[in-house]
Amino acid sequence: MNDRKYLNNEWKFSEDAETDATVSVRIPHTCKEFPYHYFNESKCQMRCKYERPLFILDEWKGKTLLLTFEGAAHNAEVFINDEPVYEHRCGYTAFTIDITDHVEYGKSNRIRVILDTRESLNIPPFGEHSDFLAYGGIYRDVYLDVKEKMHIQDVYVRTHFPSGRAQAISRVKVANPEPAVQIRQGIRLHGSDNDYTDVGYVSATKGTMAFSMGSIRRWEPDDPVLYDLRTELLAEGKVVDTVITRVGFREAEFRKDGFYLNGKKIKLRGLCRSQAFPYVGYAMPDSMQIEDANILKNELGVNAVRAANYPQSPAFLNRCDELGLLVICEIPGSRYIGNIKWKNQELQNTKEMILQNRNHPSIILWSIRVGESEEDDDFNQRISGLARKLDPDRATTGVHRKPKEHMVEDVYAYNDFGAGLKGAACCRKSEVIPDMEKPYLISAFGGVSYPAKSGDDEARRLGQALLYSNVLHDVEQQVDVLGSFGWNMTDYNAHQNYGSGDRICYHGVMDMFRNPKLAAAAYQIYQDEVPVLELSSSLSFGENPMHSLGDVYAYTNADVLRTYRNGEPIQEYEVTKGMPVRIDDFVGNCLDAESDFTEEQRKEIRNQLNHKACTGSFMEVREKKGFFGGKKTESVDESTLTRLYEKYILGNTGLVPE
């Protein structure tokens, strides 16, 4: 039976691989901590060293010992007792080493990892400066599995619905199988205490089993039902190994007019996610990876996430399964494709990404094109063929650099960073895709188009939020666009020639600490589970030029918005789903108490007061001709308007939306 021991403690570290490792650290660990901003990113590029003792019990003789690193960025050379045993050249996928024949039993052994984090490495995602930092360190879990010589290596489950009935085909790979050994599988609802329902037996040398279930519940974004598939290895009737594989039964289909899950059309409304955090880069524990998924689904209200530029944490993907959050999983890289050695490594990365993650029901697309890279049909065909071989049921995509490029993927993806900056909020499908019969996805928008800091003035933060609102609303209206992904969930560290010159790209709808900006509300108002009401303004006259309030918007998922002044109603606004409400009346019927003015004058005065509140100045008053606001009235001079402005606007103790 499997015995897993986590090895996240007792590590020693040195920033120089040639010196003794003396600094005590725990995993996850970053090779270099940074300030929040204004730092030299080259300081995290090094050949560093990690060391740890590992006592191997004498009773483990005859077992198989498997040492796994879930994430070591970026080129890892592993030594056991000074003997080189493995080299792994990807910082974003896990690797497992069979150390059975490399350890001494009944003794303390020493694990040493020489980690090269330099961006000069000839491996993805490196080759030219991307906008994100890749950091360095052993930043995901490390553990040792103690198994029998004959054990289960992998369980791959494919789900289908022929004639509407759920069917699963599982392929089990067994290490050192014997002819008489059998595989037994059973299934039950995840989290249930009920007994497993047996679904069949098969010889370990065959390893493939199919079974049907009539009463299965499908995995849905709003009801992400999961099942535990138990796979047991039986030798002479005795269980020698057990693996629990969590699966979800669902059908994902990409058509020219949209994305369909279990036959129902879903508009993908998501954000791109970077796994970076302040100070420590990638080195955050599983709890924070899980929290990011929680934020995306429960706080921001998105239904999808693009795990951009590299494969992300198993803990993050597991939580997406549990939440019903749809995922695009992506190979490492951005813009650059290197030489043959670089390409071969990317093929290996693709293989590892798919083999390690293909049982996740949340993953609906493999993004297998180096994002925004120049066209390389031969290379792209090789990756595409590999993906289809390893996972025939899941569609593929890839972010294209330009419109109308040749596509080998199932879904054409394009970063429309011009969206929201022109007349039509985003490009039409016909402007981008080479074949209108293929599905089209906006893989990124926003970001560099309109960065905004949390500390920027209200107008800047509102501008970013309105861009998101306009694009999201436009995508909702385009029936032949699968959906869109805003860039980005959070701000993130970048190279000097990107971002704002302080090593941060302020592209997020949240800051690096996961505090929401106003743009977050552009997503939040699409969900109905939690009431949302967010004002774009503090209603402070000192915030904007000319002692004005500027443009004031309310983001809400209510059907109707009402505003009040000191408990008295001002105005009522109808709300368009997914769009903010512009608040342009701060007076309402307050002027009814001013009996010295006619109804027409009160109407014009209200327009004047609201205009000055928003812009800082009155509209032109042409007193000599008896005109006020372009209409003939009894004369109302500017001093009277100023007096009323001070009374009803400056004297306002607070606009209250409801």
Provide a role label for each language-model segment.
Residues 1-70, 121-129, 135-138, 545, ...:
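Extended carbohydrate-recognition surfaces in non-catalytic/accessory domains of CAZymes
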Residues 5-6, 11-16, 45-154, 177, ...:
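Accessory beta-strand-rich segments of carbohydrate-active enzymes
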Residues 31-69, 73-81, 86-89, 117-124, ...:
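Active-site-adjacent substrate/metal-binding segments within catalytic domains
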Residues 60-63, 103-108, 212-226:
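Short glycine/proline/serine/threonine-rich loop/turn segments at secondary-structure transition edges
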Residues 78-80, 165-201, 209, 550-572:
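Beta-strand-rich binding/interaction modules
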Residues 112-114, 228-232:
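Extracellular recognition modules
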Residues 128-151, 488-493, 498-658:
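Catalytic cores of secreted or luminal carbohydrate-active enzymes
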Residues 294-295, 304-526, 530-552, 567, ...:
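Substrate-binding/catalytic cleft of secreted carbohydrate-active enzymes
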